[in-house]
From Swiss-Prot:
Cofactor note: Binds 1 FMN per subunit.
Protein's gene: pyrD
PANTHER family: DIHYDROOROTATE DEHYDROGENASE (QUINONE), MITOCHONDRIAL, DIHYDROOROTATE DEHYDROGENASE (QUINONE), MITOCHONDRIAL-RELATED
Family annotation (SUPFAM superfamilies): FMN-linked oxidoreductases
InterPro entries: Aldolase_TIM (IPR013785), DHO_dehydrogenase (IPR050074), Dihydroorotate_DH_1_2 (IPR012135), Dihydroorotate_DH_2 (IPR005719), Dihydroorotate_DH_cat (IPR005720), Dihydroorotate_DH_CS (IPR001295)
GO MF assignments: dihydroorotate dehydrogenase (quinone) activity
Name of the protein this chain belongs to: Dihydroorotate dehydrogenase (quinone)
Length: 339
């Protein structure tokens, strides 16, 4: 059935297809239709897992970028995910970069996007989270607005952290999207140190205010040198971050040279990212020595490479592009088999 649906949406522009899918899942998540979706999917229960102090119903999650505004929480939840990471969301709504900004690399099962954190703002997302019936874990991925100067970037993260804290199972700090100018600079040196210090200080205040501890993860890029990766791992440990997501999209085109749309600017996700993200997970695991859990993301399209990420050191996994190319059966297969 999904192959038929895929054939239809692949006739559309990639972003229009995405928006159409979100609307379909929003409708399917409606209490009137959700039982029908669940009866079609037959999602297995999966294996519960405690990570970052949070009890996940199963270790398979939806990666950020799929449901930026939390419009289809219950629809995605019905597919069997143990957790959903919503966003990236910013303090105020923004349109993102000029269209077209999403491109399929069909022969490689990849996607290039240069969206630029298009979203309806943190308040809109929080309202959707409040209204959702989904029983799994909700992560909220936060970023900075495009026109906020880098020097004031931490203020945007703190603003979103304040808003999201009471409604999130965990929060992700996204400093690794290649589509917001200079954002990746926040991964390095004094910027990184200052940002993490400010976030941890605010987390302590919020934990006392709400009488609960909400873990905070950092999402990193795959395009890191060895010394950069070592430095990032050291900084994460020093600031006692609760988790790290490896990885975001890549700016490399090594695996897709010459293919249609490969020349488009933006972050490349999907199968071409598979090996690179697994290697980053492996090296990160060696550096972190089990002190901080890793959430693996990047190119998961089947059980074998999902298992490779677990063996490399990931404790939880996230999918997005693989869902576009392979449909809900991918989620079902992973939930059924990954522990």
């Amino acid at each position: 059935m999904y192959q038929l649906f895929r054939h239809g949406i692949f006739q559309m522009d990639a972003e229009k297809a995405h928006n159409f899918t979100i609307q379909c899942l929003k409708l399917a998540g409606n209490p009137l239709f959700k039982p029908i979706l669940k009866s079609i999917i037959h999602a297995p229960k999966g294996f519960p897992k405690m990570v970052m102090g949070v009890n996940f119903p199963n270790p398979i999650g939806l990666a950020a970028g799929a449901d930026k505004n939390g419009d289809a929480i219950d629809g995605f939840g019905a597919l069997g995910f143990g957790f959903l990471e919503l966003g990236t969301v910013t303090p105020v709504a923004q349109d993102g970069n000029a269209k077209p900004r999403q491109f399929r690399l069909i022969e490689a099962e990849g996607i290039i996007n240069r969206n630029g954190f298009n979203n309806n703002g943190i308040d809109y997302l929080i309202e959707n989270v409040k209204n959702a019936r989904y029983k799994g874990v909700i992560g909220i991925n936060i970023g900075k607005n495009k026109f906020t100067p880098l020097e004031q970037g931490k203020d945007d993260y703190i603003f979103c952290l304040n808003k999201a804290y009471n409604y999130a199972g965990y929060i992700t700090v996204n400093i690794s999207s290649p589509n917001t100018p200079d954002l990746r600079q926040l991964q390095y040196g004094d910027y990184f140190d200052d940002l993490l210090r400010s976030i941890k200080d605010r987390q302590t205040i919020l934990a006392n205010q709400y009488n609960k501890y909400v873990p905070i993860a950092v999402k990193i890029a795959p395009d890191l040198t060895e010394s950069e990766l070592v430095q990032i791992a050291d900084t994460l440990v020093r600031h006692k971050m609760d988790g790290v997501i490896a990885t975001n999209t890549t700016i490399s085109r090594d695996t897709v040279m010459g293919m249609k749309n490969a020349e488009q600017q933006g972050g490349l996700s999907g199968k071409p990212l598979q090996h690179k993200s697994t290697e980053i997970i492996k090296r990160l695991h060696q550096e972190l020595k089990g002190q901080i859990p890793i959430i693996g993301s990047g190119g998961i399209d089947g059980l074998q490479n999902a298992q490779e990420k677990i063996e490399a050191g990931a404790e939880l996994l996230q999918v997005y592009s693989g869902l576009i190319y392979h449909g809900p059966k991918l989620v079902k297969e992973l939930v059924k088999n990954i522990k």
